[in-house]
Every structure is written in structure tokens, then in C-alpha cells.
Amino acid sequence: MNNIVNNTTTANVINTSDIATNRNIVLCGVGGQGTVLASKLLAAAAMSKDIPVMSAETIGMAQRGGSVFSHLRMGKNLYSPMIKTGTADLIIGFEPGETVRMLPYLKEHGQVVVSTHAIKPV
């Protein structure tokens, strides 16, 4: 999995000087890791810079450590909060297994930031 992790910063993925280009970010993890909170914080940061934002969360059995993921879209001319497969600029993964599950959303040359700490199912 190391070949999909790019050690560059995310500054070029979330460049606020060019909001004409949409940015698609998928955040994923398991219930209790703060995935939805992180999504809301990123959305609030973008909105504070007058960048249009759309987001959607999917929370499945979250209170029991179930899968949680958020789609966060920034930029102009957004018509849906959902990110199409193969179009995410960035995946932020709080749990490695959930990150692998979201890889189909990543576009070619997209970036992945992932925690190496796996959450064992109970």
C-alpha cells in the first residue's frame, strides 16, 4: 500500500487560490474516530474562505465501530454532494481497511493520507 501514499503536502490538492477547479475529498474511518467531525471542520475552513462546499456523510452502525465515510466537494458549479468513482483528489483515511475500501473513488494521480493504526472489529 506504500506505493499509493504520496509524501507531498496536501496544499496542492486544496489550493484555495484556484476555486474554479473543484476539489473532491473522501474521508473514511470507523465510528468514533472523528471522521464526520473532520469533514465538518474542513467544510467550515473552506466556507470561511468563501469557497462553496457540498458534503454528505454515510454512517453505518457507527456506534459499534462500523464504516463511516464523508464526501466533501469544494469549488464552483457543484450539483451533487456525492463524489463519482475515480474522481477524488484526496482520500483521508483514519483506518487502513476503510481506506482500501474507498480506493475506487481515487482519481489517477490522486493522493491518499492514511493512518497505519488498524481498528480490530469486535
Language-model regions: role of each:
Residues N2-V122:
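Active-site cofactor/cluster-binding pocket
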